[in-house]
């Protein structure tokens, strides 16, 4: 079992505030289960000791209304979101925890746990990089669906693309 994580953030560094967390649990055939939560920006900054990047805020202002409006619904305190994600992930003990970039999703999420004196719910050696895989197999295109820059939609699309890479590129 593997998990693909996607974050929407207000920065690009390890101390970026997370404003949405999406995840897709998958095997070599399909996405089996999903997780999604929005996080209150004020809580992410105040409670999570995160730092907003003004350039990222300006970037978000240029994104589609559908992606931005989804972030305003059902926001939770950062610590609540982290506990809920831990409770969703921990029973599975995934083989790999994937993010779109070796220095983005997994690092930001792990660092958020640590800043709140919590242990990330996976071991660091399970970190995997989806961006590396898609770079190794550029001929295998993704069948993108859903709203771009929606953490759940992106996690599901990335997981499905990785499954396609495993099948077509690696013969798994």
PLM segments and residue spans:
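Non-transmembrane alpha-helical segments in soluble domains
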Residues: 68-69, 86, 110, 159, ...
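Acidic, Mg2+-coordinating catalytic module of metal-dependent nucleases/exonucleases
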Residues: 92, 96-103, 107-108, 140-172
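Short, flexible loop segments at boundaries between secondary-structure elements
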Residues: 121-141
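Hydrophobic positions within alpha-helical membrane elements
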Residues: 11-13, 110, 134, 159
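Short, function-defining helix-loop hinge/capping sites that tune catalysis or transport
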Residues: 14-16, 113, 162
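Short intrinsically disordered terminal tails
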Residues: 1, 52, 170-172
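Conserved non-catalytic scaffold segment of RNase H-like nuclease domains
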Residues: 3, 8-99, 145
């Amino acid at each position: 079992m593997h998990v693909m994580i996607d974050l929407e953030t207000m920065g690009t560094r390890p101390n970026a505030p997370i404003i949405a967390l999406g995840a897709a649990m998958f095997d070599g055939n399909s996405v089996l289960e999903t997780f999604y939560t929005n996080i209150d920006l004020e809580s992410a900054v105040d409670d999570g000791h995160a730092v907003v990047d003004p350039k990222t805020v300006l970037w978000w202002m240029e994104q589609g209304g559908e992606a931005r409006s989804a972030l305003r619904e059902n926001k939770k305190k950062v610590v609540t979101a982290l506990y809920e994600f831990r409770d969703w992930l921990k029973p599975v003990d995934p083989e790999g925890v994937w993010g779109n970039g070796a220095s983005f999703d997994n690092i930001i999420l792990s660092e958020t746990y640590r800043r709140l004196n919590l242990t990330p719910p996976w071991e660091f050696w399970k970190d995997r990089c989806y961006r590396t895989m898609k770079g190794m197999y550029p001929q295998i295109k993704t069948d993108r669906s859903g709203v771009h820059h929606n953490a759940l939609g992106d996690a599901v699309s990335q997981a499905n693309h990785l499954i396609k890479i495993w099948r077509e590129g690696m013969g798994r």
